[in-house]
């Protein structure tokens, strides 16, 4: 943001410009917005924490954005409401500078997080074979930390120490604004750097994302689907682990992965799904043989370039003799970050030995790989991510644009912006923090369901909500 108050407010009388009923109305509306902002962003953070299906790299960026929005809801909204209804700043220059530093650092961090989300999605769509291998949780954490540190360095020192740099504090008593914004050129420059430039970058990135997605959809419709070559049982290299207390996993992630190669070796670049590939896998405690096809990119599987991976694991039930096999078919030519996979669950009888089980595993794999790939539409999860990003960007532009337009006008004509209009424009920037959680819920069914479970105190199986 830029300019905490309209520079034309100099000499403002230390009395409230509003009548009593207006003050009550402003406090009720502002207080409600603050409360909704706090609750909404806490829901986002808790949802990502408790639901493993939301623990993805993309959602970690949303978690960081929710942290920034939460701080705005707790501090910025309420202090600005106080400043507005009283008509002057009653907390002194030190608290004023601390509030401004916090407000601008957090607001800039929000913009930086939006840029990160846009770049992340852009690289996922345009570099599906090279970017995913770099797209790790550690990398995401470093990018998020860099966004916050850079925002702090850009704003906090200048806001807190500018008066000492120039040798005098020019902000009048009873007012609270950034001192170096008295310079019109600086105000204009910061508005460009803090809003207009990021908006241009994000708009261009989203245009490329949309164009790449549409291009892939057209390609999918035109290209015929090649049937998969059957996998010979002799190529199946698996090891059945006897179910005992030592190797029974205590969590859903404990699976052994043994690969069956058909054609070329898999490329490391497609080991992670840019959309929701970080979701954890779980074995099913079923009592019958079942095959669940979840091929999200079957139409891109080629005849001579595919990799079939099997995952062998056991049920958590100590008395179970089940064997769970997961077949993941990954394509080398796919321009999507989403690998195809087929999950097969095999239940062995208690009398079967290891060789018999292995033969059954081989036959089941051969049977599944003989099936021709079916034409599927583009992954719905990919659409969810893209739709969520679009909603967030639109909300950001719509809520921040009025204020930043007024900033430029105020640079050349300070009396042209009425104080009430200025206050509304400034508040719209804050309302963006209220809208963001609603964008997640409306565009992502998993977020919506998790929100509902949390609000209704339905905690059973909340970690597996999809």
UniProtKB/Swiss-Prot annotation:
Residues that bear Phosphothreonine: 446, 450, 465
Phosphoserine carried by residues: 232
GO CC annotation: dendrite; plasma membrane; postsynaptic membrane; synapse
Extracellular side: 1-22, 81-97, 163-184, 411-418
Subcellular location: Cell membrane; Postsynaptic cell membrane
CDD domains, sorted: 7tmA_mAChR_M2 (cd15297)
Keywords: Cell membrane, Disulfide bond, G-protein coupled receptor, Glycoprotein, Membrane, Phosphoprotein, Postsynaptic cell membrane, Receptor, Synapse, Transducer, Transmembrane, Transmembrane helix
Record: glycosylation sites: 2-3, 6
Coiled coil: none
Pfam families, per the entry: 7tm_1
Regions of this protein lying in the Cytoplasmic compartment: 46-59, 120-139, 210-387, 443-466
UniProt-listed PROSITE patterns: G_PROTEIN_RECEP_F1_1, G_PROTEIN_RECEP_F1_2
Post-translation changes: Phosphorylated in response to agonist treatment.
Chief location of this protein within or outside the cell: membrane
Polar residues: bias regions: 284-293, 304-313
Disulphide-bridged cysteine pairs: 96-176, 413-416
A GO MF label: G protein-coupled acetylcholine receptor activity
PANTHER family linked: 5-HYDROXYTRYPTAMINE RECEPTOR, MUSCARINIC ACETYLCHOLINE RECEPTOR M2
Function noted in UniProt: The muscarinic acetylcholine receptor mediates various cellular responses, including inhibition of adenylate cyclase, breakdown of phosphoinositides and modulation of potassium channels through the action of G proteins. Primary transducing effect is adenylate cyclase inhibition.
Family, per entry: Belongs to the G-protein coupled receptor 1 family. Muscarinic acetylcholine receptor subfamily. CHRM2 sub-subfamily.
Self-association and partners: Interacts with ARRB1 and ARRB2. Interacts with RACK1; the interaction regulates CHRM2 internalization.
Protein name in UniProt: Muscarinic acetylcholine receptor M2
Source organism (scientific name): Sus scrofa (Pig)
